[in-house]
């Protein structure tokens, strides 16, 4: 699905959150690799699960056409610096769910882009009768966990020793969820998974 873009002014930086279009594909392919190499908060290391320009064009086309999909980018002066994606399922038993992933270039951390992408996605999900929002986040990513709590998500469980990072140690993953029944009368289910939708 495609939504109307919105401009944000945070900490002296102006950026736009809008739906992805075909001409974004090459930039998206490049920054995805860069982001994966900048943080261990994602599931991938740099270059793993590579998606080229054509691959992103196909994803953008699908997400623009499917009612339960949403692909957003954060843009600064015509440069894409982050993106998020909601992906639904065609399976009837899973049709109420949407999986969400978000990533931002490290140099643009601290400008609320992740929050803006998440809030826009939550608003879109609520307007499209989505019932539950859930996500998975590394337990050591305390800032993200606090943000998710502020946006109405609660801890649902812990995946013990879920990820092995570069220091050779194993880290837990926190599963969080937001039930829209608590916030308004109608809705369905959205899954937020850090870095898994790409």
Identify the residue ranges that each predicted region occupies.
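Terminal substrate-recognition subdomain of acyl/acetyltransferases
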Residues: 1-11, 168-198
């Amino acid at each position: 699905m495609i939504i109307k873009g919105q401009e944000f002014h945070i900490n002296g930086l102006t950026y736009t959150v809008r739906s992805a279009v075909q001409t974004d594909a090459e930039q998206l392919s490049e920054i995805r690799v860069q982001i994966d190499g900048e943080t261990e908060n994602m599931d991938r290391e740099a270059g793993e699960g590579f998606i080229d320009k054509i691959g992103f064009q196909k994803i953008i086309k699908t997400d623009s056409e499917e009612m339960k999909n949403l692909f957003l980018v954060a843009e600064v002066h015509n440069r894409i610096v982050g993106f998020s994606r909601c992906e639904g399922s065609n399976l009837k038993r899973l049709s109420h769910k949407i999986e969400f992933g978000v990533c931002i270039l490290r140099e643009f951390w601290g400008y609320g882009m992740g929050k803006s992408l998440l809030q826009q996605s939550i608003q879109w999900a609520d307007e499209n009768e989505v019932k539950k929002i859930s996500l998975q986040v590394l337990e050591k990513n305390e800032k993200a966990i606090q943000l998710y709590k502020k946006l109405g998500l609660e801890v649902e469980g812990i995946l013990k020793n879920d990820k092995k990072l570069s220091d050779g140690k194993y880290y837990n993953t926190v599963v969080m969820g937001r039930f829209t029944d608590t916030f308004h009368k109608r809705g369905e289910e959205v899954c937020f998974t850090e870095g898994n939708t790409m």
